[in-house]
Every structure is written in structure tokens, then in C-alpha cells.
């Protein structure tokens, strides 16, 4: 009898800790977010235009599903009677529900933003003290994604704050992807898998490849390669339904074509969420080609869900590997220098053994066809050593297809 009671108590306890919807992010989420390009300068017209462009550009067809409206969508004060958040009536004259219905009619999903503190980062009403009320409000709108930031939190405990919001969303019974955006300050990779589907592993990204950049107000963003360096060691914490997030994409926002290609390639290698942040209504053919490269995206979305890693680094040229579900491998050679760099990689002399996934690449016992992910060229097999020149701040990204 005591054993039965103990089992019942354990079952109740486990159920009480179930506080996120499973299966919403079996592969890294893909979509678009308004912040990088528009900050709080958002509107109903903009959102509809972005939704239309996600469809017409082919982004939806290759997997970009979530349209996320970041900071600035709400009025500066809550409803004086109900305490509810109020979508800004000037920015959204037909209301938020009608706009969400429009986005859903395009076959897309919709996300909103708020903050764990008393205010959002831009000074709009935060969620602190309103977690369950806001969760019910989001459920009534039918949103699919919530980005939850970390401004104006004072001495708030991060684990408790995000845990409370996660429980509130779960209680509201609307399946919503919960994106924890506390910048990696409190090591969310150690505790956030029970709360949400992705967590920021870095501070905010900027439009810069590497180095130290200062933006207005003295803000120092993380350049692309700093985000990479911070995120890469955390691979063991990532996997289906719980992803490391080194922040949104800056592809198309001002870096060079080579730097954009490197940025996208490494986000794909690291199984990072692919959340575009450019004005896709006006993107160039080059930007579109990078963001919609089906082979790179397939590497990112591989169902094995293993984050790739930096296998070797010599003279600022890095070699990355990522095991894939069907026995194939993704390989990326990254040139962090400002000069072209020649590489020569003898597959048979390298025994790539990934303890995390228990996958092994041994070209001495198996042969792989080599396909260049960006040029789409077939490049012989691993029976021969691989030679190439990697251009400055660029990559050579390969898929090894097992024979």
C-alpha cells in the first residue's frame, strides 16, 4: 500500500513540474523578428507586408514559419480597469486579433514579445506581477510564440521568473513556443529546458563580423563570431525542443556577402534558431539566396538535433563538424582572417568521433561523396584529400554523403 501511495505522489509531482508544451520545436524554430531592423517602429501595414513577403519570397516554403513582433507593440499603459495589455491602437488600428488572423491565413504562425521585468527594454509595460493574466491574454489572441526579455528585473531571480511565466503559459492551454531572452547571464542552459524551447546563450548580436564595436549610447553588441565563440561550448545542452540561441540573424543588414554567408553557415552548423532580422520586403537576390539555401537549412533542421562543434583551429582557420541523422556529415571550414587561406584536409588521417551523438566519421573504412553547400558542386569523394582556398571572412561548407 505504501508503495502505491509513493508512486501516486511521484506521478502527481512529475505532473506538477510539466510546464511547457512538448513537440513544438523538435527542430530549431525558423522565422522573422521585427527588432533588428525596425526596433519599435512597427505597424499593421509592416506586419502584413512582411507576412506577404515571407510567402512570396519562398521563405515560408523553406521553413520560415514564425512572424514575431518584438518590443513596442503595446500601448504605454495597461487597461486601467482590467489590467490587460493594450495593443497600440495607432500602430494596429484594426486590433491585434485581426492582424494575427491575417498572418495565420498565410499559413504562418505569430509571436509577440514581453519582458520579465516591470517594463520592456523600450519602456513599455512588462509582465512582472501579471504573468498569468498576460498568458491568458496571449492565449485569447491565439499567438504561437513568446519572446520573453530580461530588462527592468532588478534583483529578480531568473529561474523563478521564467519558471513562473512558463507555468502561466502552460496553464493558459495555448501551445506557445517560449523563447527565454535573458542573454545567458544566469546560465539558462543549465535550467531552462524544463521551461521553454530555446534560450539565449549570448548578449545581443550586432551588425559586425568580429571585433569590438560601439553603437550609440555606448552599447557594445556581440559581433557574429563572439556569439559563435560563446555558444559553441554549450553543445551538450542543445537538442530537440531545447535549443541554444545565439540571437537572431543579421544577414542582409550591412555585413559583406562573405560575412553573411559565414553567419548563416555557422548558425546552421550550431543547430541554432534561424530567425531572420532584415527587411525581407526589400532584400537583395544575394541575401535571399543565403537565407533560403535549402541544403544549409536541411543541415540546421536535421532531425538528429545535434549542435555542431569546432573540431580544429589553425592560423585562424577553423574546421567544424556536425553529424546528421542519416549517417551523413556537415563540414565547415571558416576563415576568420582578412586574407585568403588555403586548406588541405586528409579525410583518411582524421577519425572524427562525436561522443555526444555516438557518431563517427572514419573515411578509412567508409567513403563519402562531397557536395559544396554553397556552389552546389559535387567535389569528388573522401577517398582523396580535400583542398580549397577559403576567402577572407568566408566559409567552405560541405555535406559528406555516405556511400
Predicted regions and their residues:
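Bacterial Sec-dependent N-terminal signal peptides
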Residues: 1-20
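N-terminal module-boundary/linker segments of secreted carbohydrate-active enzymes
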Residues: 19-44, 48, 53
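Structural recognition of the beta-strand scaffold that forms the well-ordered cores
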Residues: 24, 28-34, 63-70, 109-114, ...
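Active-site beta-loop-alpha junctions enriched in small/polar residues
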Residues: 35-37, 72, 115-119, 151-153, ...
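Aromatic-lined carbohydrate-binding/catalytic grooves of carbohydrate-active enzymes
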Residues: 50, 54-155
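Glycan-recognition surfaces
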Residues: 130, 177-279, 300
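Carbohydrate-binding surface patches
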Residues: 267-270, 275-277, 313-358, 393
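C-terminal beta-strand-rich structural cap/linker in extracellular carbohydrate-active enzymes
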Residues: 381-403
